[in-house]
């Protein structure tokens, strides 16, 4: 396996600028069950805001790059000179910065929006980061550079209360007809075509999904519902890819085994942060209960015998706005 790529490890492009956004100050963070969380928006966003979480997000960026055969976006999107690109929930900013590197030195603009400002201090001149709750009115930085050629949204299930409202907002800020919206989501319901699901993993998945349902930010992934919402809230030409994510290297082909190795690594880094706050705050489980569940799930993830044939599904949706839509 290749090393995990981080935004801070990328070479500095000529003309790089200092980011205007600082990392969260100590008073903006609070500690809970051994992890750091951002004070705002405490009652909504349930994932940590520490370095360990940043590393986890970068593992998924690497996984998606492998799935896309070393590309940064799907073939539906065209990013070229003078393109404007928006990344919703940009995390560490790795994807945004990689996009800027790919197009350098052509003029373009890449904007990353997130509730957590954990991106590098030194960034390409074509990159901007803005602190934003993307369900609230968008920031001036986001609005003034619309319409966009590409709006990217990855792994935002569990962070959004109203997908229809967000889809309408995205459609309103996308270039009519030519602009593309891309959404990547993992269905965390484990599957196996020829055997049972490992019990601890099934329990982990069931309980986290129940907690996030109660929290009002479901992580469930319904293909038909997503397609219907996109079509009913401003989009046309909706396309979907369904990709198997083996949770270990049991696939018969080398590409499947490589995806399995990376997803196994990502899953190992995800069971605890994805369950800690939901089970503690929403389901009122004790730290000991959560720790024991995660240790049991982790043992299964690390066991080839338990994971043989087990997988999740990754769904990639691409969509354009209707020809008649105008901002």
Curated annotation (Swiss-Prot):
Keywords linked to the UniProt accession: Methyltransferase, Nucleus, S-adenosyl-L-methionine, Transcription, Transcription regulation, Transferase, Virulence
Q: Kindly give the Gene3D superfamilies that the UniProt entry links to this protein.
A: Vaccinia Virus protein VP39
* The organism's place on the tree of life at top rank: Eukaryota
Observed effect of gene inactivation: Impairs the ability to produce TeA under the DMSO-added, TeA-inducing culture conditions.
Instruction: Enumerate the catalysed reactions.
Output: L-methionyl-[protein] + S-adenosyl-L-methionine = S-methyl-L-methionyl-[protein] + S-adenosyl-L-homocysteine
Any Gene Ontology CC annotation: nucleus
**Protein name in UniProt:** Secondary metabolism regulator LAE1
Which gene codes for it? LAE1
């Amino acid at each position: 396996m290749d090393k995990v790529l981080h935004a801070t490890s990328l070479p500095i492009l000529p003309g790089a600028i200092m980011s205007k956004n600082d990392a969260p100050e100590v008073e903006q963070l609070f500690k809970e069950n051994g992890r750091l969380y951002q004070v705002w928006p405490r009652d909504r966003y349930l994932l940590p805001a520490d370095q360990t979480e940043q590393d986890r997000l970068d593992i998924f960026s690497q996984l998606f790059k492998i799935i896309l055969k070393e590309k940064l976006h799907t073939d539906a999107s065209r990013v070229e000179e003078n393109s404007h690109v928006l990344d919703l929930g940009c995390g560490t900013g790795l994807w945004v910065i990689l996009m800027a590197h790919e197009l350098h030195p052509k003029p373009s603009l890449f904007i990353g929006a997130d509730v957590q400002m954990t991106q590098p201090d030194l960034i390409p001149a074509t990159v901007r980061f803005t602190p934003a709750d993307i369900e609230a009115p968008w920031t001036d930085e986001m609005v003034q550079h619309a319409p966009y050629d590409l709006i990217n949204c990855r792994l935002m299930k569990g962070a959004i209360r109203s997908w229809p409202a967000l889809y309408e907002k995205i459609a309103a800020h996308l270039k009519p007809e030519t602009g593309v919206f891309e959404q990547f989501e993992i269905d965390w319901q484990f599957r196996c075509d020829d055997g049972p699901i490992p019990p601890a993993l099934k329990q982990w998945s069931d309980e986290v999904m129940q907690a996030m349902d109660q929290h009002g930010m479901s992580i469930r992934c319904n293909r038909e519902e997503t397609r219907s919402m996109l079509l009913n809230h401003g989009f046309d030409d909706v396309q979907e890819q369904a990709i198997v994510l083996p949770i270990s290297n049991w696939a018969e082909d080398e590409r499947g085994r490589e995806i399995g190795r990376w997803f196994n690594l990502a899953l190992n880094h995800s069971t605890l942060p994805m369950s800690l706050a939901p089970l503690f705050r929403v389901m009122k489980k004790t730290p000991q209960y959560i720790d024991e569940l995660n240790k049991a799930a982790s043992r299964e993830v690390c066991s080839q015998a338990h994971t043989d044939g087990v997988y999740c599904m990754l769904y990639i949706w691409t969509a354009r706005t209707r020809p008649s839509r105008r901002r």
